[in-house]
Amino acid sequence: MSKPVIAIVGRPNVGKSTIFNRIVGERVAIVEDRPGVTRDRIYSHGEWLNREFNVIDTGGIEIGDEPLLVQMRAQAELAIKEADVIIFIVNGREGVTAADQEVAKLLFRSKKPVVLGVNKIDHPDMQEELYEFYSLGIGDPIPISGAHGLGLGDLLDACVEHFPEDEGDDYDEDTIRISLIGRPNVGKSSLVNAMLGEERVIVSNIPGTTRDAIDTAFSRDDQEYVLIDTAGMRKRGKVYESTEKYSVLRSLKAIERSDVVLVVLNGEEGIIEQDKKIAGYAHEAGRAIIIVVNKWDAVEKDDKTLHRFQQKIRDEFQFLDYAPVLFVSAKTKQRLQHVLPAVKKVSENHNLRVPTHVLNDLVMDAVAMNPTPTDHGKRLKINYVTQVAVGPPTFVFFVNDPELMHFSYARFLENRLRDTFEFEGTPIKIIARKKND
């Protein structure tokens, strides 16, 4: 199930970014220790009343015919289209402006739930400033202060009331859900069409749980698959595709509903920062991952080209060192026959369980090979380890002091797990917990 999406809209300089930062709080900070994982700070996650959601800051909506204003407005409309709930921010000190009225008309036409936040109400004496905003026809204005963090609980309470019901995908648990993600023009839709055409399979289009998403179900060699949000890959227009944060928004919804993510790169153009950002979202979500280099037929090659590109991927995607790499061409069907077998394999690895006794024997051998670290004379002691989850495989190490589990030693333990078991294509989570917890 994809998380609900809140879009924050309003004219420029009403405090949208401040509200955004208040809602997401420290979640904007990067918590991944490995190099290369970056996050677009215009887009982040939040949680309120035990409901997780995604939130996006749209930038200011201005009325005018200048090309930049037209593009900004179009981008905001796209965010509104993707949102489940809209927070409309206005400036309580300036009152209702003509621009506010135009934004209100835009929101009214969208027929989406709208929560009206009147910002910069920094003192109880300013409550009377609210009444004017009833004229926008949006509903009850909620007084807030982004600067002081006032009223945000009421704002989020109202948003949660409009969240859609938490419904899961109605697919059999043995069905492998696949999403293709990547920046514009890497050939995602061409890959989808080539994969479906190549396999000569029975194909059916199924409405996804995300609004206007269409999933494509098919089977191959007695394995059921679903390609998530194929409509999203095919329908985007130029404005949508040229705006990183909105294509990322759609990709994140697809990632959340997937078991396996194909990170698609353009072999002709090489690797850019946006590729790393998009791949980072799949890694952070804990999905099984395959890196697919498309358009390989168009690359001029010598006998070292493949090796150089592989090394470039390993250098740029150090946080995806577990992901297999496939070089394919949607146009010529080159190596496409390897994609689905790789998907099936990494899905199996993503759900692999290791018996507890085997796990503990491995850890004892690892500690004998490389003793646990010490800090100020105190040594980390691993009492025992158990696997608590799959998808991704998650291991809890019960220790004397979790603070002593340095990142480098956790990495060593992960590498020992990978050397021993089939974990290609899947991230691994290692959690240190005090023995008595």
From Swiss-Prot:
Top-level lineage group: Bacteria
Q: PROSITE patterns under this entry?
A: G_ENGA
Q: Does the keyword Nucleus apply?
A: no
Recite the UniProt keywords alphabetically: GTP-binding, Nucleotide-binding, Repeat, Ribosome biogenesis
Q: Which residues bind GTP 1?
A: 10-17, 57-61, 119-122
Q: Does the keyword Repeat apply?
A: yes
Q: Name one GO biological process term.
A: ribosome biogenesis
Q: Which residues form the KH-like domain?
A: 352-436
InterPro entries for the chain: G_ENGA, GTP-bd, GTPase_Der, KH_dom-like, KH_dom-like_a/b, P-loop_NTPase, Small_GTP-bd
Q: Provide the binding site for GTP 2.
A: 182-189, 229-233, 294-297
Task: Tell me a Gene Ontology molecular-function term this record carries.
Answer: GTP binding
Q: Which residues form the EngA-type G domain?
A: 4-167, 176-351
> Self-association or partners: how does it assemble?
Associates with the 50S ribosomal subunit.
- Indicate the family of this protein: Belongs to the TRAFAC class TrmE-Era-EngA-EngB-Septin-like GTPase superfamily. EngA (Der) GTPase family.
Entry function? GTPase that plays an essential role in the late steps of ribosome biogenesis.
Output this protein's name: GTPase Der
Lineage at the top is: Bacteria, Bacillati, Bacillota, Bacilli, Bacillales
Q: Which gene encodes it?
A: der
